[in-house]
Amino acid sequence: MARENSVMLVGRISNPSVTHSEGSESSTLTFSLAVLRRNKRIDYPRVAVYGVEKSKAYELYEQMKRKPMAIVKGVIETTLSSKTVVCPICGGKTKVPRLFTRVVATGIPFVLRENYTPSDFAEVSNNVKLLGEVCTRLQSRNGCTLYQLNVDRSFRIGNVPDDERHDRPWIKSFGSIGEEDAWRLSPGSVVYISGALQTRHVDRMVKCTNPCCEGEIKYPELYHEVITSRVEYLHNCDFAQEGYFDVRDSSDDCFEVFSSPEESEAMY
């Protein structure tokens, strides 16, 4: 099957860091990127740049400490992992699953030397294109639809075997697109998506695993999800009412339904 997993971001760099692997001649750069979209929302995706020659990595790091604007071309990477949280009552440790998501740059970020601001690039600052298969049950309510997409990775990251080169980002659609997604899509549907990468902080709750404690642990989670602006229905979709829905760009009004991330999360 054809592959598409591409991200183009323009924003202001913050919190850069450099790490080295023992015995390797290359380094990894990581940083956050403050991206302003045309709906005035600011997102903070995490970005990684692998395989940077050590001297070049330190040169870039010194530039990034000044918080410049930069252009990043990359792919969305998702990794299943876990994190440990501590119970405030008994001090016991509990492992919770997480889907770690970030953007992996496919080249060295282009650091802008001019005195630009995020608003100068709001129209073109955040663009995502994905081709993949719906791999979870759809959750839909009030014109908002949420699902995960299984995307074949075309860019090799590390020594990952070919049969494991998949990413599964969360997809969220609103308005007429959300309604049409709910009607046409089911697990196994293949779609081509254009949209923007959104980040939001959510407070999660989990019960302590200590059998002598019934406490609840509250912990923060940073979510990355793709907000669709257009969906093309390619295969295994319900085409029974072709043309019934008004397919349009939902990016301008998709945040009018929920005034805050907490309100949006409450529907699930």
Where are these regions (language model features)?
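Cys/His-enriched microdomains
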Residues: 85
